[in-house]
């Protein structure tokens, strides 16, 4: 409806490329806001219609008048928008804004003199509207009033009434109103058309008021028409846009394409606008060759390059990066770029300038003025500068080639760019010579992006340099900076010239005068370089060329419409030429852009793209409601198909107008439901074979030949015919064939299983690809063939999985070795069981193909054929659920049943860490079955945290799996989602939506799109593998798992429910007692933490910092403590060996006779590492470290450190490298020793031990030997904390040492090292959370303490604390649990170690923890001990004091029963035996705390330390082989239980119910306290511990 003079719709272009891009546009990409996307200007002042009252006559802005007109046009404007942009909507404020613009125009047309006829309105339009929009608007209005069929959309009758009554106040003919309304409708349609184009370019679908302001600002024609006054220009802050540094290859390629499109438009401007207008005034077109040279050849090269770049981008949408080097290489090898050499020499020659001047001097040149306002001056001044654009763009190519070569990651791409650089080097040199020959004063055009960036920088500079600069001028007028120069201004009436500094922007020209009298500015004032003298808005300025005269040369005139003209003079002719070129470019660019758009649309109308007839090509059937239905306005981009026939789907899949990669993915995922693979390939081959243009245009050829006579007519017909064929091949054949190959590439790349199932399909595809011809197509055929070859090779060579982060899988965990047919939940390690289930289920999940889901084939008869992998995972999940259910119900014995249930929950705990939701919900389903859910007594016997965790897992499946979905969205892969949810959703979609649209035969593709969305979610979790090893025995067990072979579901359910009733009858008051089914299997769980952790030191810092200590230690074999077994109840010796300063033994956790595997630094690494850096010169290594003097394990990479889930959960590390033999290790750390094992089978000596005094060991040691009772294992064995229902006992050997340089402490598998000359220490280990190294980061001075796990103070705990005191000790006062006990003054030479250990291991319980001197239950003992030490020191001689050496070794042996008739001591749990009055360490409890114990202390800290050292030397003399130092407790933080001195080495013990120290054969050996009461139920209290605990990393 809205068309220009030729009947074609006209649009405005945005883009500010070299020369003619509009200032506000963001290029063809249509970028968003601000200076890049439309200037950020606000168009018409302030969002209102300011200025309407400036016109004489009716005031539309008065309240009473505005109320009559408000909302009159908005309903009709919606209809106008539907006509120009059917798929775009507009907000109400945008429509009101357009309405106000229309009212402003109406006020202009109805101003005095008042119009009485149509001719009066025409005159006003000619005067008010700038060219060429005045003629287009008048033609549109005349067509409306002259046509009986066409009527205006705007309400003509209402406007006619208001005009007569209110505006004009006299009667007018209805034709006048109709004419006015038609003009308004044309202008409103033009505005809405431009706004719609703009929002589509920025990927929006709704027009806002701001969008209209942007496009109004970008169009000078409309701004001229509305003639906005300066007073109503509102300031718009110009913010610096995001810097696009093009750091990536992809972004650079996109920028190249953007620049290439703008360059193509500049070439169109040269060819279509200037060249074709000049052809009209010459007799022979060859006269223009000196001016334009071979510009057509350059245009062809540009089109070819741009097409190749776009093809590469489309083909590589799902690849890592597009490789565009081949695009340049093909053109360079064909010497296509050489056209720039000829062009550069021709255009810059004097002959070219002379030819243009001669042309303009011809009489016919006067007709150029009719081409548009200022066109003749544009030809004279602007065209020569525009002709330099192709030369400058050649240098843009050189820059892009160099930049892309540097960014490319493909070796082939880099080689292509290197080849191109070599081929184009001669051209580069030639063009540099040409540019050097140009006059230095002749300015070279720059790109629009550079001009926009310069505008931002210069406006900020002018704010600082120019006095009286106003920010309000910036917003819509300073989007591009054109130039900065000096001109002379002629004074008014006098021949006085004044120098002006001129700044030219796309919408503003500022003339400034230099500040010659610079004064020292006052405080806070700014010193300006210039003063603002004049400013002109370029849309209201005309430029008039002034011929040279004797008085005035090189001058031109600026003629503002509202101000008197001024004359400016340039330095010389070339200077004037450049200024005129820039000024005319700014003024005429909007008019030239509109003219170019009209020409391009006219070309399309003259040479329409014709489609083949449906008879010869079935994919050319026109769209209709019978073959395709589109979605309702889903987006402003590519239309979405709701339903279509199969041929229409194939047509849109390979559409010639646009590419839709989302539709390609959706179609290839879901097509199998309505089309077979064979049928799809056949349709794609038919789609590729497009009819020849001779068959399409044969009717036009005969008609044209008969309708034209003469040679000229035949030549014109041939040219037109050639253009038709050319457009057909370029715009239809090539895009369709290219997109067919793209679909084939996607098919073989992402759905190759179709070809694996059907070899004939693959053979047919290869046969088709062999016969594809054409150089451009062969390149893409080769890419498809490469993918096919790669897929075939992958099938033949089972590629090894490369795990994320480069980690190795953790080693296999074993619990009990039993035959395969005796595997149960109790025999498998819960950690490894969960790992293997997760690994198996992920592989099953990964193998499910989209073809197994589309159309719900798993519910059909042939499901075994169509959905084999899906049925496999469904069957496996059901079997696991049945197996858990059967294992629980068949366990008659209550303790076994409870252990099995606990073991199943532990498996779920690990699965939650591994994100195996499918496995978790399968076990939850087993717990929720009728036969298990009713076992009330069994569930009540579970520990509290187990019950709580089970409830949390059950909540995952509540409320339609709401919490599960939230959790799934929050985790990072790898994971195993619950497949049942996907199947349910797909089934609901399949059954709830018809396959065909209602009352049609069209495929319901919206249904397929929804299914594809679900399948896409499934696929996104299939690509990240687990870093786990496969254990063949467990894998085979679960692959063959069939708990009820051959039974029906009803038979299984009945059997399980009957078993459940038998083991727990209805209403039973107590649990029935049954004998144990597996009496030989220990019921205690090994926990869910790995029980072996090798120790290695891969830090390079350790080798130098500990060389002296290691060398001294390696020179001797070391002292060990051997707790001999003198009673039948003791079967093991605790053997400790420490060869180096960096090694300390911990339990291996292996079964008897089993060798631990080679160390793996990432043994427990499953997920991404977490960094724990150095703190205060102490670095924590990833694993407990050791240095071997006999061999190197070959590990050189820095291992990923680990953190424990709970404080006190001691992880034992495999340390066979430091033991005398593997058998010794097996004995010391076996989880349970059989009762029949004779003592002789155990080693009772250490080959490294000697009778002589051993050199000091640099590290304290802790060796744990579990008791022989079956099922009672020490918590030190590296598993989850023991349940209070299981007692534990162990033999503990502590070997301590003190050095002047630093201390290292080991307890329960944790190694705490204060830095010894930079030596890195160790950190606790977690099996599932990796902690990578970052030793160069600085943190607080000391590591933070672990989170406290303080127990509630109860009466029994208080009594136990009192029992620990000496018999004559005073009664302990009650203490508040939150108060910190007063510290003992520190030993200066051990302050570093004490400070370190206090904060790094504040919760290490009985064996590792706070200094015993910091605890109230030991402080009084230490006071009395001090006096005893003083007396002994005075009575003991010191003959060997000097020979003792600076290093001493403390050995503390806590042995189990020595005599056969003595009862065993109470078991001690390190996690449950801490003092009941211990409060968490706070920063105030530093070693230098001034708090002093309330009991008197006679000696100062320094004298006290001296006495301790004296006593140490005496002990060394008394016991040269094995000696003890009690004062080492507060120096190295040994266990804080009190010790008493006894001279009688054979003192007997009392009943274990009361606490008496354990005696040894050595005087002064510390005594082991009793196990405290477990009534606090620490582990089962959810407030005290969580399911997976992690150490705190924050300061308490």
UniProtKB/Swiss-Prot annotation:
Residues 248-434 form the DH domain. Residues 1352-1366 have a biased composition (Basic and acidic residues). The keyword Phosphoprotein applies. GO terms for biological process: axon midline choice point recognition; defense response to virus; epidermal growth factor receptor signaling pathway; epithelial cell migration, open tracheal system; fibroblast growth factor receptor signaling pathway; imaginal disc-derived leg morphogenesis; negative regulation of G1/S transition of mitotic cell cycle; photoreceptor cell fate determination. Keywords: Developmental protein, Differentiation, Guanine-nucleotide releasing factor, Neurogenesis, Phosphoprotein. The modification Phosphoserine is found at residues 1550-1551. Pfam families: PH (PF00169), RasGEF (PF00617), RasGEF_N (PF00618), RhoGEF (PF00621). Promotes the exchange of Ras-bound GDP by GTP. Functions in signaling pathways initiated by the sevenless and epidermal growth factor receptor tyrosine kinases; implies a role for the ras pathway in neuronal development. May form a complex with sevenless and DRK. This is Protein son of sevenless. Residues 1175-1195, 1280-1291 have a biased composition (Polar residues). Residues 480-588 form the PH domain. Residues 829-1066 form the Ras-GEF domain. It comes from Drosophila melanogaster. Residues 1073-1105, 1175-1212, 1235-1291, 1340-1392, 1465-1596 are annotated as: Disordered. Residues 637-792 form the N-terminal Ras-GEF domain. PANTHER family: GUANINE NUCLEOTIDE EXCHANGE FACTOR (PTHR23113), PROTEIN SON OF SEVENLESS (PTHR23113:SF363). Residues 1096-1105, 1469-1489 have a biased composition (Low complexity).
